[in-house]
């Protein structure tokens, strides 16, 4: 099981604890982003990891951010950006979590931790994949 928070197994490269290209990390991330993780959810709005604190079917945007930051695949990064742009529930901010099928059902209308991590993602993409911005 992996949780959406950072630090998490999915966020190890962000902490410098693993290289995102390391085969062991890649397998760990693939497991976390699969149905084998009881807190991985896929719905009409997005796919991502949640956690036991909020309940089932609630995706944390932080998990989508870390997924994008751990990827070198332009299509994966674009998909993550699309999910992040379309799941703010009309507020323009990242939330703690949102429902996998209905992003207007969310927790915390403004969540500084997720907003800050999203800012880190923007800087990361500008440095690594500026053509995607």
Regions found by a protein language model. Name each.
Residues 51-133:
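CBM-like carbohydrate-recognition segments
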Residues 1-63, 70-72:
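Extended ligand-binding clefts on enzyme/binding-domain cores
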